[in-house]
């Protein structure tokens, strides 16, 4: 029986730099996204050299990381360096990994919108599923199996039609979308590389995490933006889908710390990262409006339900069936006991504080740039 090669005691310590300092070089896919930008900030503060893979687009898509350039006006790089690449192109991944020789890889790049994955099912599978395999294979091709640690952004959408409440690392998966199914393949191929090649590879099963940097087509950010516009008189009403969907919402800033902690653990293990608290979309709406001094009262049922302002009588929220998913995920609640015990991690930002931060940030943004 063939034996797996021995794993380095610390992949981070490989290739010591000057004066015997450990070489801390991170490669982040999805660096321009919400999580990627917070993770880049976090790692730069820890003294890492950070490399990010960005897709080429006709307009700059680096808004969330502009401030991390040495000279943001001239896009002059300091300890953060960007490389054009794509998870659908294995050649470029091999080239970048061979050039950078990272000690830690964080695979955050994905088509991450669940509803859109029903329209872009094949693309989602290619990027989120096979893209993860391409990245892992690139590590193997470059001979870095024993000197790199690999973090895979897994998701609570793996649980989908939940088999137990709350969901933990041992809960059976039942994805309910092309996104969830693609991420399920990614989850298992990471486990396979860990077991077959002794790669230090982990899955972070992250429950919903939000921030002012959340993409505008995600429900929480759609709510905070719309509420800000209503407060500023730029909008009167907006539409949502399933108001009673319940989620475990945390702050992205807390969750990127958990990603890093997983790679500092002695052994590669998968972890659920969550708050353990559940709130509905309806509740997110109500709390958002309270932050601009409005009380929402609900009238009607199902697609005819509306949210009316108690103070003015104006309808600010309606329901539109087009925002429902073909197969809904009604309830997600994570149990992060393992992360608390083994990583000493816990969420810091409470739900109320998260909602307040998002609404206030969007009020400032919409005040200066209504079309942002």
Swiss-Prot record:
This is GDP-mannose 4,6 dehydratase. Residues 1-20 are annotated as: Disordered. It is an enzyme of class 4 (lyase). PANTHER family: GDP-MANNOSE 4,6 DEHYDRATASE, GDP-MANNOSE 4,6-DEHYDRATASE. Catalyzes the conversion of GDP-D-mannose to GDP-4-dehydro-6-deoxy-D-mannose. Belongs to the NAD(P)-dependent epimerase/dehydratase family. GDP-mannose 4,6-dehydratase subfamily. It catalyses: GDP-alpha-D-mannose = GDP-4-dehydro-alpha-D-rhamnose + H2O. Pathway: Nucleotide-sugar biosynthesis; GDP-L-fucose biosynthesis via de novo pathway; GDP-L-fucose from GDP-alpha-D-mannose: step 1/2. It comes from Homo sapiens. Pfam families: GDP_Man_Dehyd. Its cofactor is NADP(+). The modification N-acetylalanine is found at residue 2. Its EC number is 4.2.1.47. InterPro entries: GDP_Man_deHydtase, NAD(P)-bd_dom, NAD(P)-bd_dom_sf. NADP(+) binds at residues 30-35, 55-58, 86-87, 108-112, 123, 183, 209, 214. The modification Phosphotyrosine is found at residue 323. GO terms for molecular function: GDP-mannose 4,6-dehydratase activity; identical protein binding; NADP+ binding.
């Amino acid at each position: 029986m063939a034996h797996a090669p021995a794993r380095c005691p610390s992949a981070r310590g490989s290739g010591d730099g000057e004066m015997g300092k450990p070489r801390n070089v991170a490669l982040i896919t999805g660096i321009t996204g919400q999580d990627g930008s917070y993770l880049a900030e976090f790692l730069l503060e820890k003294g890492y050299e950070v490399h990010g893979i960005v897709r080429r687009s006709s307009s700059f898509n680096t808004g969330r990381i502009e401030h991390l350039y040495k000279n943001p006006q001239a896009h002059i790089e300091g300890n953060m360096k960007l490389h054009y690449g794509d998870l659908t192109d294995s050649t470029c991944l091999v080239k970048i990994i061979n050039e950078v020789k990272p000690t830690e890889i964080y695979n955050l790049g994905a088509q991450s919108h669940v509803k859109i994955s029903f329209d872009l099912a094949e693309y989602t599978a290619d990027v989120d599923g096979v893209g993860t395999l391409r990245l892992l294979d690139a590590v193997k091709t470059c001979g870095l199996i024993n000197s790199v640690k690999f973090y895979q952004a897994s998701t609570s959408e793996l649980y989908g039609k939940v088999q137990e409440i709350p969901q933990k690392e041992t809960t059976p998966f039942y994805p309910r979308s092309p996104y969830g199914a693609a991420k399920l393949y990614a989850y298992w191929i990471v486990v396979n590389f860990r077991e077959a090649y002794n790669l230090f590879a982990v899955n972070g099963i992250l429950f919903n995490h939000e921030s002012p940097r959340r993409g505008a087509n995600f429900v929480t950010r759609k709510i905070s933006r719309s509420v800000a516009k209503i407060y500023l008189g730029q909008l009167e009403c907006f539409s949502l889908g399933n108001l009673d969907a319940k989620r475990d919402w945390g702050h992205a800033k807390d969750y990127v710390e958990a990603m890093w902690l997983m790679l500092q653990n002695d052994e590669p293990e998968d972890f659920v990262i969550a708050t353990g608290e559940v709130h509905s979309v309806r509740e997110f709406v109500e709390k958002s409006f309270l932050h601009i001094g409005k009380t929402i009262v609900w009238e009607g049922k199902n697609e005819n339900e509306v949210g009316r302002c108690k103070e003015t009588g104006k309808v600010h929220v309606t329901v539109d069936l087009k925002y429902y998913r073909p197969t809904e995920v009604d309830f997600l609640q994570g149990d992060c006991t393992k992360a608390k015990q083994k990583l000493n991690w816990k969420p810091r930002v409470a739900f109320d504080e998260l909602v307040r931060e998002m609404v206030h940030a969007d009020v400032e943004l919409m005040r200066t740039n209504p079309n942002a």
